[in-house]
Amino acid sequence: MFKISLNRVHDRVEIKEGDEKIMLRVDSDPMRMVAGLSQAQKMLQELNKDSSDEETDKAALFFATVIFGKEQAETLVAFYHNDAACVINVCGQYFSKRLGKLITNAQKKMK
């Protein structure tokens, strides 16, 4: 006998800034994001005051891509006019409020 359990996340994430807003969709298994999130964390931790804009932008785009997918990550970056700090902030908030607990719970179930 076996058990199949899905831990998929199906979210619509609405982001508002002033009068502008965008809607991003998340349809993914958080456990499949773990490797990408680890890489994003490493890239973000390596950033410092001497990091180039290119390094910062690359880390922000990668983080957003892991969570939202490539096309929507590019939409998010464009929405914030290439402001990496805003992109990182949005991704971090979504991760901490939604994905972090799901990943932790799924990892506990696997043990």
What are these regions (language model features)?
Residues 54-59:
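Contiguous, amphipathic alpha-helical segments that mediate oligomerization or scaffolding
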Residues 40, 68-71:
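Short acidic, glycine/tyrosine-flanked loop/strand segments centered on an H-E-D-like triad
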Residues 1-46, 105-111:
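Short, charged/polar N-terminal "headpieces" of proteins
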Residues 48-52:
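Charged, low-complexity interaction regions
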Residues 70-111:
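C-terminal charged interaction modules
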